[in-house]
Amino acid sequence: MARRGKKKGRPISGWVIFDKPKGMGSTEAVSKIKWLFSAEKAGHAGTLDPLASGMLPIALGEATKTVPYVMDGTKVYRFTVTWGEERSTDDLEGQPTKTSDKRPSREEVEALLPDYTGVISQVPPQFSAIKIDGERAYDLAREGETVEIPAREVEIDRLEIVGFPDADRTEFEVECSKGTYVRSLARDMGRDLGCYGHISDLRRVEVAPFTDEDMVTLAKLEAVWPPLPPKDEDGNVIEPAPRRDFSALDALVIDTGAALDCLPQVPLSDDQAQRVRLGNPVILRGRDAPLEADEACVTTRGKLLAIGYIEHGQFKPKRVFTAG
């Protein structure tokens, strides 16, 4: 049997709530963070377009197992709609497809907001990652095809005006469910107002359970990044190489368990924790221990240990973590 290759990088686990700059793709951002932390494994919880800035939660190591819980979280965006043009991509990148000389008043925009609050039907943009017959919509759109993308329901918890800098632009903040396309909001509001519109600025400020206070910029990460060992003219590390100190960088990592605030959390004793590590169920003790739960997580010494479910007061693990 062939030996499995040794994993490259450090076995660090947790969340880096990255303040992605404009112009950087989500995959590029993950690669950058993985490299900075010299991590074995990394992934993100929800794509953010290159033209957008703001929160991109990036999971390191064992935290990648909790990505689905963050992806399901409520999102908050701040965005600017420029009126008078509808574009092929519904943002600044596209070509104008429809134009209008009309500009909406603040009163007209405010009167429209209730129609975009609650559960609404929305057609994703032509340039989106939606799959049509196995192909991404944006790939088909780049080839000049106009594809029929079915409408789907999304939930808008809150949509409000936060600025009206001039007649051409309105600034909004929206709190919405997974799967909401802010570009579609701009397009549809423009059509309803009879003036057309597209996104000219987009920033994500929250992905539940994380808030804007959790975000770290690339500059902050690079300021505490431990430099690589010096190399000679041939590219070989000069020995003895000093040990790299990642402590300041690692201090910016949020515990893996923070992603599971939506689940009941039950602390275990050391003996119970050992049983769960081996994949065995345990009877939960204590007056406040839940008797039933479709999903729950357990902790040991303040660190996440496992996700599972509770049945008749017994926790049954489905996913065990090796690091908190």
Curated annotation (Swiss-Prot):
Keywords of this entry: Isomerase, tRNA processing
Catalytic activity field: uridine(55) in tRNA = pseudouridine(55) in tRNA
Disordered, as annotated region: 87-107
MF annotations from Gene Ontology: RNA binding; tRNA pseudouridine(55) synthase activity
Domain of life of the native organism: Bacteria
InterPro entries: PsdUridine_synth_cat_dom_sf (IPR020103), PsdUridine_synth_N (IPR002501), tRNA_psdUridine_synth_TruB (IPR014780), tRNA_sdUridine_synth_fam1_C (IPR015240), TruB_C (IPR032819)
CDD domains for this protein: PseudoU_synth_EcTruB
Active site residues of this protein: D49 (nucleophile)
SUPFAM superfamilies in alphabetical order: Pseudouridine synthase (SSF55120)
EC number: 5.4.99.25
Family of this protein: Belongs to the pseudouridine synthase TruB family. Type 1 subfamily.
NCBIfam families for the chain: TruB (TIGR00431)
Known function: Responsible for synthesis of pseudouridine from uracil-55 in the psi GC loop of transfer RNAs.
Protein's UniProt name: tRNA pseudouridine synthase B
Organism of provenance: Brucella abortus (strain 2308)
Top-level taxonomy: Bacteria, Pseudomonadati, Pseudomonadota, Alphaproteobacteria, Hyphomicrobiales
